[in-house]
């Protein structure tokens, strides 16, 4: 067959299935038969028209697992292998790439955002962007990328065992950060405005403490992570940070952040942005899943098929209160 099915977002608020040519093999790349796709907040934003600098139509999907159709040139991937797709396409030559930080490549293109992604039956990606997922289920493999974003933020913070750590925002990225902060030995407090989200979080991480916005105890923390996507919440982060602490911004928003310099300075605050993830983060996540330290079965709360995704995704976009991660079975 030379054609495949793809889920297209032709414009904000619209989705349709479309027949497209299957990608052709080319040097240095591997074709992947997509098996599972995690739906990210970015996908909901693309559907809703809230993603800036995006050109429609677009095939969404960057949280991907599938089966390799070709062998990689170095022999690490064989046909039929279950693989996790690293969706960050990088130039390899800019300052960030040369310095070991391709996650913030100056010319980065993310599958499903800047170029067409994986809500389809097959894609072709650079072989360096495929990581064998031996020992993982196909569903778990599709969740590695979003978990790696949380793991990367935690790695940036260099948490010490026992560090009192506040994570604001109990969506998927906040939960990912909470999971890996706990794995690093931190004492985790998870905060959100939604009682429903906090109840979900408690089911995923029963060892973490939770509190609702508006009911906070007036205490400070060694590290604060923001995963809200709210400028107001991000600007308030210093209120909860102890002296000598680290503030990590997992969220990115369009706008300016403002901190009172005396509060920022007297804490000798370490302020960190965290963007995407590195191969080492993907590897760490997969190792932790294999060891049973990541409750992947409790994270995948909803699922659908590619044929039904055009009907289900708008429903989930309208109300994500009871949803952690929805998975499309291709």
Language model: regions and residue ranges:
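A short acidic, Gly/Pro-enriched loop at the edge of an enzyme's catalytic core
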Residues: 216-224
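Mid-domain Rossmann-like dinucleotide-binding core that forms the NAD(H)/NADP(H) cofactor-binding site
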Residues: 136-213
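Glycine-rich phosphate-binding loop and adjacent beta-alpha segment
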Residues: 231-291, 330
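Residues in the short beta-alpha loop(s) of Rossmann-like NAD(P)-binding domains
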Residues: 50, 193-194, 253, 277
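Glycine-rich beta-strand-centered segment in the early N-terminal region that forms part
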Residues: 23-37, 50-95, 134-136
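NAD(P)H dinucleotide-binding glycine-rich loop of Rossmann-like/cofactor-binding domains
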Residues: 89-168
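C-terminal hydrophobic helical "lid"/dimerization subdomain
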Residues: 2, 235, 279-330
């Amino acid at each position: 067959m030379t054609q495949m099915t793809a889920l297209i977002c032709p414009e904000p608020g619209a989705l349709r299935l479309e027949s497209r040519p299957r990608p052709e093999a080319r040097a240095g790349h591997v074709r992947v038969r997509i098996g599972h796709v995690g739906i990210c907040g970015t996908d909901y934003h693309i559907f809703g028209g809230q993603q800036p600098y995006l050109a429609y139509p677009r095939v969404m999907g960057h949280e991907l697992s599938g089966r390799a159709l070709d062998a990689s040139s170095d022999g690490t991937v064989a046909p039929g292998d279950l693989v996790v797709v690293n969706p960050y396409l990088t130039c390899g030559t800019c300052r960030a790439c040369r310095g070991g930080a391709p996650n913030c490549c100056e010319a980065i293109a993310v599958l499903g955002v800047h170029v067409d992604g994986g809500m389809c039956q097959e894609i072709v990606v650079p072989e360096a962007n495929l990581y064998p997922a031996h020992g993982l289920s196909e569903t778990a493999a599709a969740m590695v990328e979003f978990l790696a974003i949380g793991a990367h933020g935690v790695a940036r913070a260099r948490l010490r065992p026992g560090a009192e750590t506040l994570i604001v925002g109990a969506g998927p990225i906040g939960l990912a950060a909470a999971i890996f902060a706990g794995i690093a030995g931190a004492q985790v407090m998870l905060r959100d405005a939604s009682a429903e989200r906090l109840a979900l979080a408690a089911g995923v991480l029963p060892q973490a403490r939770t509190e609702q916005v508006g009911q906070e105890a007036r205490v400070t923390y060694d590290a604060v992570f923001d995963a809200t996507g709210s400028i107001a919440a991000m600007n308030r982060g210093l209120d909860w940070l102890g002296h000598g602490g680290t503030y990590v911004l997992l969220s990115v928003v369009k706008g300016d952040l403002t901190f009172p310099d005396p509060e920022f300075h007297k804490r000798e605050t370490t302020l960190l942005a965290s963007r995407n993830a590195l191969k080492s983060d993907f590897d760490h996540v997969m190792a932790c899943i294999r060891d049973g330290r990541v409750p992947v079965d409790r994270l995948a709360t909803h699922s659908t098929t590619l044929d039904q995704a055009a009907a289900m995704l708008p429903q989930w976009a309208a109300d994500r209160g009871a949803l952690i991660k929805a998975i499309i079975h291709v």
